[in-house]
Amino acid sequence: MDNDWTRGSGAGNDQIHANDMFYLNGDFHLYWSVNYWGKDKHAVHIVHAQSKDALGAYTEPNKKTWMDNRIDPKVFRDDDGQLYMYMVRFTDGNTIWGRKMKNPAEFAGEPVCQFASLPDTWETMDNRVAEGPWVMKYRDRYYMMYNANHTSTEWGNYQLGVAEADSPLGFQNGNKYSYPVVGCNQTQLEEKQVDLLRYGRTYEPLFAYTESKPGSDWTKVTYDDSGWARGETGFSSREVKGSTTRHLGTLWNTPSLWLRKTFSAGSETGNLALRVAHDGDTRIYLNGTLVYEKQGRDYCIVNLDKKLRAALKEGTNLLAVETNKGRSQFFDVSLFDMKDGIADDILMTPGQPNILRGPNGFEWWLIYMANKNDEHRGQYINRVQFFDKTLFVDGITGPRTAGYHPEPSMPTFAGKGETASFGVLQQVQPSVAYLFETGVKTEGGAGIVAWWKDADNCAYVGLDAENRSWYLRTLVGGKENKESYALPEDFRWGVYHHLRIERNGGCLKIWLDEIPAPGRHVFAEALPVEEAGVPGVFDETKSALFEGATYTIGFDDVHFQLSGNEELLKGDFLNDYEFSFQLSGLSGQDKAGSYPVYVDKDNYVKAQFDGITRMLEVTAVKKGKTAWKKEFPLGCLQTLYPDVKYTDFIEKGYRFAAPAWLDTLYLNRHEAGNKSEFVDDMFGKFDIEYLNGGEWHPIENKDRGIAEHPAYNYCTFTPVKAEGIRFINKEAEDLERHIYKIGVHELWKESYNFRAVRRADKLYLFVDGRELGALDIRYPASRIGFCSEGGSPVYSGTLYYHVGQRRD
């Protein structure tokens, strides 16, 4: 930094964090937070500098004062070119604000509060924090991803949320998603798998412990520990209020500690995963067999191998622990029954999000920081999907996470580095649907070839310096048409500008500098629908430069409806591709779906949602005969968070994205505000109703009791079609929350997201982000299609693209 207001203080370059950067019209703009809390002064401000070169040097245009308060700047450019800055202020905890900008260095309006974190939600598990905003626009919707809770692993609650709005400054508490989109994977582990050390027939959290060294046989089941004290694990010398990772169960201030915990296991007990957090040297024994030993500090999960699991026996078992004080003082342990699964690493505290396009131009990727086990923070990346317009993240994942989590897809063709004009692409597959983009540096008379079949059938998108305009020039059958549109007054020549086109049949969409081209963006009938071609670049001056050309076969955001027994085929014949869509308007009587693989009428794979069987039915046909058929049940357990628009301490309201058929509810038996209070029948505290057709109806339970996971009560009922569920406290004087998240067994619903990935002879299938299977297929290059049998299904948010080969 080089400015007047930090000079002579302790606020130096080592206090810079939370950078944001963007390129506009030849300049790189860098924004950062100064986060200095010193005895000489406090300097907690947002700063701006700019440079002609990405690597600097950067100069602050205003050295006298800072740009704004306080931290986490993010600049977003809307489709009309208007700039907005989002930042965090310390007004109600850490609060997110937005502000219109005059230019990259100046503001044009007053700050507008977007939101703070809400009490009694996942956002306030510890501290009042909403920070790290990242704003993007896609499919005509605005998305803000943000962090909530304290960033430190000492709490372990840092998570990522999303708000979705219809204007850049329209984010508010009511349009937040009710749930975190990326959180700690231990939450799901604890909800799905039973911790044998805490749950038997009921909640049994107490361990026997002593602070005096016991006799030599203390690790054996037969040892008499009746003289030992009893306490809940989470042994610590201090309380970290709201912490998940270092929850205080019992105070511990001596150098060493010995623990014993008996638990039951049966023939149904499966694989075991030991989760342990300790600050000093620790040994853990299972029925006298050493299963864990480590010096110093750690926080990890250990999947016990076959040899170590052999120590487990039917009936009563004993876990014994010796642990010691480290630099700090904490110990906690869990033992999960994984059934036939394997536990992942501990992945937690995702934060500081950046959402960027992937290398192929179609995908979106989330880049963020997170922690694995007790390691230092690292960089993580996960795919961002859109279920039509709902943002979904395939994460949090790490190196050992089960399932299909590929690297970012490569384009069909990628040109690296700076080059002169290379004309139209050679030796690439022509197509009627593709994306092409590149950087263009010109004084005029250059641009991209949007479509090339031959000299009489082609299209050009060019920059015209003489007329300060851009143009689309097409030739179809030798007949020429040219349309020109004015460029912004401040458009600079001789610097790089980004051009992007998407062709889908006859439609051509054009972007300039990553926003819709000024004047006109969509040309619905610019090209012949069925005439395949390739893109490229052109330079009439022989002095232009191009950088980073990308060509990917595919299309984005097709919206259409089928009716009756109808089929629609699309796409090129490829061996590697991804294909997804949101399917709506499903009834309980019809079938609708797609051809994730279609070679011809006698060779294909069909995947259909069947409302009668409530299955995804997948059929492979070869040479006109059924080769195999698989059925994947669509019924599943969903976790719902209360919708703040319909929730307070008296009534808890939950909404479904689409009407769904339900037959079972699950409630956590721990009181929402006090986990140590364990309730025998949580359902007894509420009147429960479901919403259908705008009217509320009571749920009449058939059976209720303790679920397979003892932390939950269940309630079964005759299946109902519901748009929402609400829980109303039965007693008028009862003003407690009691519950937060609920479990819902969903049988069927009116809308699903479907995704298929073909990688040569393997086909991966997903529904609503859940991987159903990886199927072996053997077909030549194929395209995709859509199909219905009765009904009028609607397909929206359709995305299809080639997965190119990596070329290093």
Where do the model's predicted regions map?
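Short, solvent-exposed beta-strand-to-loop segments that form ligand-recognition rims
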Residues: 291-299, 513-534, 767-785
